[in-house]
């Protein structure tokens, strides 16, 4: 039995070392038809800027469900958004009141616009809120639901 364990250990160490990959890519084209860049135009208020940064991260995560590819400044489409209002509310109050208290509600209001080569092709105002329940809802839920709605607009689901 000890010999079998030694053989398996040797195989376990040597077999992964015998694998590898090599790739050569020659390309003279670029896919710029469905590239998009995200531009945060939120004001200089630090609380709103932090919310804008979190929303941008959530939008980047949601882009994988659309036909767009995230690119830099030379992208064909530019998604510009601005956080107009952000109130995280009180999660503890939402848990305690089971979402009944209006003052504990977390709210996020965003204006977004899609530009194609400098021309606006669509604009939306997205309102997201978390009112509570047993878990109270998290601040990230605000950003995730707003980003999902923006991605739905980009896909043309509305």
Tell where the protein language model's regions lie, with residue ranges:
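Short, aromatic- and cysteine-enriched interfacial helices/patches
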Residues: 3, 24, 134-135
